[in-house]
Amino acid sequence: MAYDLIIKGGTIYDGNGTEPITGDVAVKDGRIAAIGTNLGEADRVIDAAGAIVTPGFLDLHTHYDGQVSWDADLQPSVNHGVTTAVMGSCGVGFAPVLPKDHDRLVRLMEGVEDIPGTALAEGLTWNWESFADYMDAIDFPHTIDYAAQIVHDPLRVYVMGDRAVSDEPATAEDIAKMRELTRAALEAGAVGFSTGRSDVHRTADGDWTPASEATKEELVGIAEAFKGLDHGVLQAVNDFDLERGDPTAFDREFDLLEAFAGAAGGRPFSLSLMQRDFAPKQWRNILARAEAAKDKGINMRLQTAPRGIGVILGLQCTFHPFIGFPSYKRISHLPLEERVDAMRDPDFKEQLLSETSEKVAGDGTAIPPLADILLQQIDFISCKMFKLGENPDYEQSVEASVYKMAQADGVTPLSKIYDILLEKDGQEFLYFPIYNYTDLNYSAVHEMMTHPQAIMGLSDGGAHVGTVCDASFPTYLLCHWARDRKQGPQIPLARAVQMLTSEIADYVGFTDRGRLEVGKKANINVIDHKNLRLHAPHMVKDLPAGGQRLLQEATGYIATVVDGKVVVEHDKLTGLRPGRLVRLGQKAA
């Protein structure tokens, strides 16, 4: 047999977590046709000697819901070996929808996920109403595969209209309709349902998200849509009313989530897990409750991240420590070059540093109150603020922090931040891990990631485009945890590959991918693991309406293959677009 493609002589990590073998992988008609040696001839041969060969990576937690309609490449995920992205996370998205609510959903996504509303308004085609219509509208050739979950906020607005945002509980009739629409979406191929209950999630107008206070009855009623189906997952984000300081909130909220997950007929459920400075024991409480839920027969998993979850701060970014200072606000509308010129004036700097930041959160803004709390403690947060450098280091000690730099220079931390942000003509960035770095190391991250109920997630690919670029998680996991880490335990490479592939595929129910096995879909990575590296994030202006976003590239991806076609070659997109919408369920293609 003549194959379409043979990947020859690589170290094959099949995704099962077992030790690798050296051999060849042959591809025919978009499927893995053979694994072994001396497999014969092929139209194309990729020399993988010295490289690792893995299944294509899956990303469980993205927000490409809008971007998928105008960006066929789904960057930056494609730059990091991702061949299947699951979107529709945290309860936000764009379907189902009535025409009168288009702007409402844009403002929702702009606020919660920091995606420019102008880009969404120009880029979205809105040629859909139902969730099935939406899936049909986005089902066209892309570079990688993608799948969609139906999301709670648009669903609630579609059914309840203005009542969805007025603190009014859903009626029994409302709940029945939401259950019916969720079932229809799942039967049309949606891979799950997501909801969000986070205090830090606000619309662009500063309002709570529509489903943030949904009742137990509503969540249980929607979850019942899964009964009798053999596919579908549930996802939630919840900070357990941390911002409101209610000591009874944690157990009350977890009871609600447990009831939600338990009502779905045994379908898998995942919850975001992270370490929070203002509730340092919360993640352990979540682990304990999740273990107890598992003992009750609830299929509960915890989405974890391989590094600190934080923000990139810079004069080009959505957020930096000076946005609330009166002097900066007077120049904030200027182009970057003019702002930098103004800020280099010593008198301007002296005046600004003599001021106190005004509140940046509140009505009319999506910025959460946490931002003001942090800005009032700039000395504290500067202990967790770092320069990433050209070879980004996300696990730095306090000795490398801005606080220590300021001490060494005999200046205040705020003055040092000011100077750093003016470097590289105002294009320098600082990294501030809001979550997962309370102890200034990854001891908690390692414990979370290696918990038996953990599953890799939380990259937020496509979201927070002006402050975050965590779609690089797969590359980071392979570089830092499976090769470079010196500060503590590493993760074996075979296990790291499993975390990015079969573990996610099995969780979602993608039976055709996630492993290098004969008959599986030929979504494959060929990686120069010894030389794999992340580059520094950088800002580009390529969104609709001239919007900007952070991108982060990698070096070391010899090839990324989707459906048997090479879509990335030596870290560059080839222009081929074999990826399509992945549907599960009765009407799956």
Identify the function of each model-found stretch.
Residues G10, G30, G50, H61, ...:
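Divalent metal-coordination and catalytic microenvironments
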Residues Y13-D24, L430-D439, V445, P492-R495, ...:
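Acidic, glycine-enriched loop/beta-strand segments at the rims
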Residues G10, L370, S443, E447-A454, ...:
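C-terminal cap of metal-dependent C-N hydrolases
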Residues M1-L5, I12-G56, P537:
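Histidine-rich, glycine-flanked metal-binding segment
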Residues W70-G192, G228-H231:
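Divalent-metal coordination cores built from histidine and acidic residues
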Residues I32, L39, G91-V92, D153, ...:
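Short, glycine-/Ser/Thr-/acidic-enriched flexible segments
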Residues Y134, I138, H142-T143, Q149-V159, ...:
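Active-site neighborhoods of metal-dependent hydrolases
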